[in-house]
C-alpha cells in the first residue's frame, strides 16, 4: 500500500510528510543547511532531523520528528516551566556542538553571518520550530535561517518567544509581565553563562531587524 502524502505547516516553505520522511522545497542557503544537519547527525546531536538526501524532483528529504510542534495559542504544556527549561538546554546543546563550525562556512546562508562568529545560530528558535513530547522539547526543526553568529543573538530571540516578551493583550502572549520576567530568568539560568543586560538589548535589536 502506497504512503499518502500529508501537507504540513511550513511557513513560506512547502512541506509534505510521506511516511517517516518530510519533503521540503529547497531555497537560498539549503546547501549549507544540509551540510549542517549532516554534521549534527555525525556528532550525535539528538535534537535535529537527519538529512536523508534529495528527492527525484530536487526536494530536501528529512527525517520526520515525532511529537507536537508548538502552534499558537500555545497549550498549557508548552507554557510550562519544563518547556522553557528543556528549550534552553537544547539551544545550549546546539551552540556547544557547533562552536567549532562557526567560521568553517561563513558565506551562502539565507541570513547573513553576524560577527562575532561564536556558534551556528538557529535563527528562529521558537515554539513553532520545536517539537515536544508533552511539555518536553525533543526536536528542533526548520534550520533555514541558521547562520554563524554570536550565541546571545539566538538566546535573546528564544527568550522573546518562550517567555514570551509581549504585551499582555498580544494574541501570542500569555502571563503577566512579572511572570514573563520570571520565565526569561529561568531560560537564562538553564542556558547558563549569558549577560542578562545584553539579552534585553539584543531582543530589541532583533525585533528592529524584523521590521526593517
Enumerate the language-model features and the residues they cover.
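A generic "structured core" feature
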Residues: 9-10, 22, 54-55, 86, ...
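Active-site acidic catalytic loop and adjacent metal/ATP-binding pocket
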Residues: 13-17, 51, 109-154
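Conserved HxN/HPN-centered segment at the entrance to the catalytic loop
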Residues: 41-54
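Conserved kinase catalytic-core helix
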Residues: 73-107, 118-123, 127-133, 184-193
Amino acid at each position: 500500500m502506497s504512503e499518502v502524502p500529508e501537507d504540513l505547516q511550513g511557513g513560506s516553505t512547502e512541506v509534505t510528510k510521506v511516511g517517516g520522511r518530510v519533503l521540503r522545497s529547497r531555497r537560498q542557503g539549503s546547501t549549507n543547511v544540509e551540510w549542517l544537519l549532516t554534521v549534527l547527525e555525525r556528532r550525535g546531536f539528538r535534537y535535529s532531523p537527519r538529512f536523508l538526501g534529495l528527492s527525484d524532483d530536487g526536494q530536501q528529504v528529512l527525517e520526520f520528528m515525532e511529537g507536537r510542534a508548538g502552534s499558537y495559542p500555545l497549550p498549557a504544556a508548552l507554557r510550562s516551566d519544563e518547556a522553557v527549561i528543556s528549550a534552553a538546554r537544547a539551544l545550549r546543546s546546539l551552540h556547544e556542538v557547533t562552536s567549532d563550525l562557526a567560521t568553517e562556512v561563513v558565506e551562502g546562508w539565507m541570513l547573513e553571518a553576524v560577527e562575532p562568529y561564536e556558534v551556528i545560530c538557529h535563527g528562529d528558535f521558537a515554539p513553532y520550530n520545536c517539537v515536544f513530547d508533552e511539555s518536553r522539547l525533543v526536536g528542533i526543526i526548520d534550520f533555514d535561517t541558521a547562520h554563524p553568529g554570536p550565541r546571545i543573538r539566538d538566546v535573546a530571540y528564544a527568550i522573546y518567544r518562550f517567555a514570551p516578551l509581549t504585551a499582555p493583550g498580544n494574541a501570542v502572549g500569555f502571563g503577566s509581565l512579572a511572570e514573563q520576567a520570571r520565565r526569561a530568568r529561568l531560560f537564562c539560568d538553564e542556558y547558563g553563562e549569558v549577560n542578562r543586560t545584553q539579552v534585553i538589548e539584543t531582543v530589541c535589536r532583533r525585533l528592529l531587524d524584523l521590521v526593517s
